[in-house]
């Protein structure tokens, strides 16, 4: 898979950080691959990046994510050393996360939007068990606050107070610089973001490493939480607010670094 294809077509002109470039070089040296459907290699940890498969088909998003959001997220995880990165979609066999694959997964990243109700209850229950009883990490992105696995883990409605896509911009603020998810991350701006307004109906998080300030088109500002963490049973859960399908958030170096850090943080600890 040609990483430059994504950088040239979709990334903002900020360039990759030195850390990311070094990580990508290490990937090339070690031969770690982005695999659409294999079992984990011995001695490697596994992260599965799941999406429902609509972003590459819908008008307004297919130009941004022509190979879908899961591929963009997975490309951004390549600097992770010792990880096998697998993409999966709702339309794959077993909805992308069969029992054998799930049992070998250390962290599951989830992006859903329109097809939350199509995810089978049995899969939701298996994911819930893997997190609560066996310590698998779970990362929910943007509209996945309504994903059935995330709602099952939270045990609440998981709704935001408002949803507005009106040209709002956002400043992402590192609130807890010593949190592992914030390692190497500096405050940054997103020129456009779908505004998710408080309150967010979830359990009180144990940490909010990333905060934010929304700036509306009229100049008014509103605070909003951008990254929230929980421990659910034996597992760790992270929710990341940005990631609307018509914006190129998942090609931004800052977002990719956050997600790399989140995978390491959420992974089961020996």
Where in the sequence are the language-model features?
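Short, solvent-exposed loop/turn segments at secondary-structure junctions
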Residues: 54-55, 93, 115, 145-146, ...
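Catalytic beta-strand/loop cores that center a nucleophilic Ser/Cys/Thr
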Residues: 42, 84, 160-239
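N-terminal secretory signal peptides
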Residues: 1-16
